[in-house]
C-alpha cells in the first residue's frame, strides 16, 4: 500500500519503513564526515558502549556516533513494536533494524535488545550479553523517555505527568500542521503525581543499572555514564523545569552526584541538551511554538543543530577531547544547550513568540522546519524516498 502519515493530536500513528532506514543512513553519513581521523587523533575513544533508549532521537544519535564515528561495539536497549507483514511497526523498530544492518555491513559488533529497560529481566539480558562477548562498558548512555515505569521492587506502575506546581499554567501553543494558535492550561500537580513523575523520570533506574553492572564487574575503569536532560527557556519554566518534570530532572542530577561519590572509578554526568523535535517533545504544550521560533532564529544565525549534530559535538567537543578534560558547569553538568541559551538567541525567540498569531505563524516562525523534523522522526518527508511507491510489507526495511 501507499503509506501517508496519520497524525492525531501531535502524535504520528504510523511509520514509513524505508524512510526510517534512510534517516538512519543519513545520520551515519553525517557522523563519518564530522568525526574525522583528525577529530579523533590524540583523544580517547569509546570502545564498548551501552545505550539505554537506543531507537530514536538522542539515544539513536548516541549509538550511531559511538559506532560509526568511533568504531565502538554497541549494545542497545529499547521497547518497540515490531512490524508484521500487514501492520506498521514503531519508527524505533525500523531504526534499530537499519542500525543493525549498517553495523553488520561494516563489521561492527551490535546487539539490540527489545524490552522494558526499567525491568531487572532486561538488565540480566544485557549482563549476560556483555559477559558472553567478554566486554566491560566504557560509556553508558541513559536516554529513556517513557510515560510509565513499573518499580521492580514493588511491582507498582508509576505514571509521569507534565504539570506545574502551585497554580494553573496557561500558555500559547501552536498546531504545527494548521498554524492555529491556542491557549492551553495545565492544572497544578498534587504530591502523589510529583512523586510518581520522579519515580519514572528521575535517576532511580539509571542508578539501578549502574549498580547491577558494577556488581557484575562490567564497568571499565574510568567508565563515563550520561543521562540526558533539558532546561529550556523562561517561556517553559513554570510547566517544565519548575514543574513535575523539573523535580524528576533534579533527582537525575542528584543521582549523578551520588554515583560519582559511591563509584570513584566511574564518571557520571547529566548532559543538558538542546530542545529538539523528538517523538517525546512533540506532545509537550508550548514546546512546538517555542521550537518553531527557536529554529527560525538559529537557522538564520547558522548554528541550528538536529540530534546527530548535537551528539557528534557532545562526543568530539565534550566527552573525547584531545586534552582529556570534560567541561562542565558549576553543577557538574555537561552543557550542549549553550548555543540555544545564548542571550541574543533567547531575546530574538521571545520577541518572535510575542508577535505570533494564527495568521502569521507560518511566515514568522519555522513551522515548516518543525513539521519536517516531526515527520522525519517517523520516516516521512525524508529526502530521496518515493512516497508514491507501494510499501509491500511492514516487517522489513
Curated annotation (Swiss-Prot):
Q: Does the keyword Secreted apply?
A: no
A Gene Ontology biological process noted in the UniProt record is: fatty acid biosynthetic process
The active site is formed by 240 (proton donor)
> Which residues participate in NAD(+) binding?
53-58, 79-80, 116-117, 144-145, 249, 276-278
Describe activity control. Inhibited by lauroyl-CoA.
One GO molecular-function entry? enoyl-[acyl-carrier-protein] reductase (NADH) activity
Positions annotated to bind substrate: 230
State the UniProt keywords alphabetically: Fatty acid biosynthesis, Fatty acid metabolism, Lipid biosynthesis, Lipid metabolism, NAD, Oxidoreductase
- Supply the enzyme class, top level: oxidoreductase
Consequence when changing residue 370 to A: The catalytic efficiency and affinity are relatively similar to wild-type toward crotonyl-CoA and hexenoyl-CoA
**Which residues does the UniProt site feature Plays an important role in discriminating NADH against NADPH point to?**
80
Catalysed reaction equations from the record: a 2,3-saturated acyl-CoA + NAD(+) = a (2E)-enoyl-CoA + NADH + H(+)
What is the entry's stated biotechnological use?
A: Used in the biosynthesis of medium-chain volatile alcohols as biofuels engineered by microorganisms. The switch from the native flavin-dependent enoyl-CoA reductase used in the production of n-butanol, a key second-generation biofuel, to a flavin-independent trans-enoyl-CoA reductase from T.denticola leads to an order of magnitude increase in product yield in engineered E.coli.
Q: In which pathway does it act?
A: Lipid metabolism; fatty acid biosynthesis
In the UniProt record, does the keyword Kinase occur?
Answer: no
State which Enzyme Commission number(s) the record gives: 1.3.1.44
Relay the record's extra comment. Possesses high activity for the reduction reaction, but no activity for the reverse oxidation reaction.
Q: What does this protein do?
A: Involved in the fatty acid synthesis (FAS II). Catalyzes the reduction of the carbon-carbon double bond of crotonyl-CoA to yield butyryl-CoA. In vitro it can also use hexenoyl-CoA and dodecenoyl-CoA as substrates.
Q: Which PANTHER family match?
A: ENOYL-[ACYL-CARRIER-PROTEIN] REDUCTASE [NADH]
Assembly and binders: Monomer.
Report the sequence similarity comment from the record. Answer: Belongs to the TER reductase family.
Cited HAMAP family: FabV_reductase (MF_01838)
| The protein's name in its UniProt record | Trans-2-enoyl-CoA reductase [NADH]
This protein's species is Treponema denticola (strain ATCC 35405 / DSM 14222 / CIP 103919 / JCM 8153 / KCTC 15104)
Amino acid at each position: 500500500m501507499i503509506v501517508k502519515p496519520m497524525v492525531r493530536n501531535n502524535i504520528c500513528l504510523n511509520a514509513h519503513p524505508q524512510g526510517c532506514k534512510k534517516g538512519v543512513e543519513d545520520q551515519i553519513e553525517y557522523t563519518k564526515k564530522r568525526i574525522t581521523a583528525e577529530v579523533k587523533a590524540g583523544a580517547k575513544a569509546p570502545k564498548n558502549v551501552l545505550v539505554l533508549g537506543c531507537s530514536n532521537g538522542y539515544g539513536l544519535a548516541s549509538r550511531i556516533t559511538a559506532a560509526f564515528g568511533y568504531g565502538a561495539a554497541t549494545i542497545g536497549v529499547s521497547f518497540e513494536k515490531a512490524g508484521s507483514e500487514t501492520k506498521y511497526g514503531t519508527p524505533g523498530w525500523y531504526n534499530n533494524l537499519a542500525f543493525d544492518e549498517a553495523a553488520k555491513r561494516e563489521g561492527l559488533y551490535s546487539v539490540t535488545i527489545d524490552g522494558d529497560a526499567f525491568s531487572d529481566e532486561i538488565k540480566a539480558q544485557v549482563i549476560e550479553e556483555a559477559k558472553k562477548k567478554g566486554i566491560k562498558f566504557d560509556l553508558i548512555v541513559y536516554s529513556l523517555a517513557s510515560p510509565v515505569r513499573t518499580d521492580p521492587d514493588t511491582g507498582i506502575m508509576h505514571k509521569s505527568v507534565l504539570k506545574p506546581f502551585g497554580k494553573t499554567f496557561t500558555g500559547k501553543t501552536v498546531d504545527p500542521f494548521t498554524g492555529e494558535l491556542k491557549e492551553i492550561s495545565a492544572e497544578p500537580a498534587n504530591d502523589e503525581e510529583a512523586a510518581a513523575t520522579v519515580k519514572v523520570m528521575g535517576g532511580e533506574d539509571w542508578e539501578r543499572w549502574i549498580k547491577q553492572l558494577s556488581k557484575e564487574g562490567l564497568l571499565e575503569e574510568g567508565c563515563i555514564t550520561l543521562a540526558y536532560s533539558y532546561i529550556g527557556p523562561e517561556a517553559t519554566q513554570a510547566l517544565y523545569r519548575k514543574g513535575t518534570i523539573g523535580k524528576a530532572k533534579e533527582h537525575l542530577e542528584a543521582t549523578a552526584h551520588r554515583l560519582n561519590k559511591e563509584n570513584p572509578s566511574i564518571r557520571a554526568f547529566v548532559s543538558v541538551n538542546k530542545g529538539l523535535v523528538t517523538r517525546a517533545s512533540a506532545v509537550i504544550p508550548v514546546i512546538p511554538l517555542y521550537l518553531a521560533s527557536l529554529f527560525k532564529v538559529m537557522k538564520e544565525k547558522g548554528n541550528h543543530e538536529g540530534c546527530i549534530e548535537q551528539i557528534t559535538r557532545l562526543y568530539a567537543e565534550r566527552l573525547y577531547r584531545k586534552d582529556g578534560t570534560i567541561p562542565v558547569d558549576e553543577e557538574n553538568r555537561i552543557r550542549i544547550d549553550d548555543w540555544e541559551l545564548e542571550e541574543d538567541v533567547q531575546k530574538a525567540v521571545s520577541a518572535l513568540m510575542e508577535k505570533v498569531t494564527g495568521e502569521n505563524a507560518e511566515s514568522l516562525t519555522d513551522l515548516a522546519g518543525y513539521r519536517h523534523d516531526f515527520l522525519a522522526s517517523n520516516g516521512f518527508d525524508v529526502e530521496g524516498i518515493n512516497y508514491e511507491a507501494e510499501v509491500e510489507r511492514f516487517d522489513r526495511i
